[in-house]
């Protein structure tokens, strides 16, 4: 966390009434969920606030969710200047600070561009990723002002395909995770999981799978369907698994259990340090429950 952002965050954290810093930690804050003085965070890097009552509360808050206004003016906070001539300064900051990514892993995958809405007469810097014959871009300057927070190139089609990092050769992997968004792919990449982005839950990547199937021959990998945990994502997970199995693919699934009002995706989990091997095991268990074909198989999974 850079100095200016840390100062602003530290000032606002006073609302939780933490005890004075000890050993680099802030403890004894009032948890917004249970109202107990069990909230704690790292004093130097207060990205995540956690309630210590694991059995009775255990709520987790990312600083972006608590103070979103600190994370929605990237061009203003991190501009390209005569001293810093980086044309991707705002995009770099958004990905590194806002998303928690290691930029060294992302070089060449994105550019900083600009989107202007002529009807609203407003614009925003964007983080743009090439996608097939077009692109997908995320608006990063107060995106709530626009009708959509992200755009595809006008007129392009992506259904039947997917997005993947250029450095990954899918013919050499034993598992491919299929997720909804590009940032989900990048988050999983940071923990050694090879993934592709479908760009929407209803996109079955038939063309991409057919091409991979032809390239791999009989050496099929396992497809791990890891869509969002909302009703649409869960329903399409089951539909896609059925379709992929009918095409000869081995399939599994992974699901993040959802709690509270805010949905948690793979990038959120990464920023909350919730993509450890134990976490992944839990997510795969919930995915297996979701796609279990019979009540008996689901009951067996729960029993084991």
Model-based region annotation:
Residues 2, 27, 57, 106, ...:
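Short, polar loop/linker segments at the starts of domains and inter-domain junctions
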Residues 117-219:
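Phosphate-handling DNA/RNA-contact segment within nucleic-acid enzymes
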Residues 60-65, 134-142, 265:
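Short amphipathic beta-strand/extended segments with alternating polar/hydrophobic composition
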Residues 64-86, 168-172, 290-299:
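Intrinsic-disorder/low-complexity linker and hinge segments
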Residues 46-53, 73-76, 80, 85, ...:
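Short, well-ordered strand-loop elements centered on a beta-strand within folded domains, enriched
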Residues 83-89, 257-259:
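Short acidic alpha-helix initiation/capping motifs at coil-to-helix transition points
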Residues 1-76, 86-124, 210-213, 224:
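N-terminal structured subdomain of primase-like DNA metabolism proteins
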Residues 1-11, 32, 50-52, 58-60, ...:
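TOPRIM fold recognition
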């Amino acid at each position: 966390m850079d100095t200016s952002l840390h100062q602003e965050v530290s000032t606002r954290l006073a609302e939780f009434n933490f005890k004075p810093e000890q050993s680099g930690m802030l403890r004894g804050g009032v948890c917004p969920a249970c109202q107990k003085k069990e909230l704690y965070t790292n004093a130097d890097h207060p990205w995540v606030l956690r309630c210590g009552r694991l059995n009775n509360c255990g709520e987790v808050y990312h600083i972006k969710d608590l103070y979103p206004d600190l994370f929605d003016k990237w061009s203003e906070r991190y501009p390209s200047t005569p001293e810093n001539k980086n044309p991707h300064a705002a995009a770099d900051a958004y990905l590194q600070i806002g998303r928690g990514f290691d930029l060294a892993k992302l070089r060449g995958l994105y550019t900083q561009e600009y989107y202007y809405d002529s009807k609203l007469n407003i614009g925003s810097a964007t983080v743009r990723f090439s996608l097939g014959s077009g692109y997908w871009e995320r608006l990063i300057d107060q995106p709530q002002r626009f009708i959509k927070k992200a755009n595809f190139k006008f007129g392009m089609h992506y259904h039947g395909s997917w997005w993947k990092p250029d450095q990954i050769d899918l013919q050499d992997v034993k598992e491919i995770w299929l997720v909804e968004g590009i940032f989900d792919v990048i988050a999983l990449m940071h923990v050694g999981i090879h993934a592709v982005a479908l760009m929407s839950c209803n996109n079955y990547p038939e063309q991409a799978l057919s091409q991979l199937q032809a390239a791999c021959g009989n050496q099929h990998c396992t497809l791990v369907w890891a869509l969002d945990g909302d009703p649409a994502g869960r329903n399409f997970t089951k539909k896609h698994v059925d379709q992929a199995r009918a095409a000869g693919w081995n399939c599994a699934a992974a699901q993040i259990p959802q709690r509270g009002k805010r949905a948690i995706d793979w990038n959120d989990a990464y920023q909350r340090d919730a993509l450890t091997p134990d976490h992944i095991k839990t997510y795969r268990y919930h995915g297996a429950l979701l796609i279990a074909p019979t009540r008996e198989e689901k009951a067996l999974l729960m029993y084991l």
